[in-house]
């Protein structure tokens, strides 16, 4: 799994990582702050952060002894753009199906 979108979607597949991204959408946070709502260890949160960082979904910086994480929007934009192509495809096909079914109903009358 080496292509960028696969790495992004793999990172997004985990509900804990999605919750971390939701929290980071509000602003930067430390590992301790990110761990507060979860019943998992700090090392487990750090592993989740490493996955998110590898996918480019977050960036991390160090100030003195604190290590903050922040959301990076570009990879989410890439995933959204990919999904948008398929949303349009299904919208168009379902609209055509709806029109076809309405024609069939009219023919039955």
Give the positions of each predicted feature.
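Amphipathic alpha-helical dimerization/coiled-coil segments
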Residues: 1-4, 22, 77-109
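N-terminal helix-turn-helix DNA-binding core of bacterial DNA-binding proteins
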Residues: 3-43, 66-81
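A cross-family signal for key residues in well-ordered alpha-helices
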Residues: 10, 22, 53, 59, ...
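Short, hydrophobic-biased segments on the C-terminal half of alpha helices
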Residues: 49-50
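Beta-hairpin "wing" of winged helix-turn-helix
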Residues: 53-71
């Amino acid at each position: 799994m080496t292509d960028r979108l696969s790495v992004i979607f793999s990172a997004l597949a985990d509900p804990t990582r999605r919750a971390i991204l939701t929290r980071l959408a509000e602003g930067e946070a430390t590992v301790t702050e990110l761990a507060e709502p979860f019943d998992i260890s700090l090392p487990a949160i750090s592993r989740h952060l490493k996955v998110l960082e590898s996918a480019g979904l977050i960036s991390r910086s160090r100030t003195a002894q604190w290590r903050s994480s922040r959301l990076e929007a570009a990879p989410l934009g890439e995933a959204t753009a990919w999904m948008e192509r398929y949303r349009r495809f299904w919208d168009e096909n379902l609209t055509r199906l709806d029109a076809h079914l309405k024609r069939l109903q009219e023919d039955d009358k």
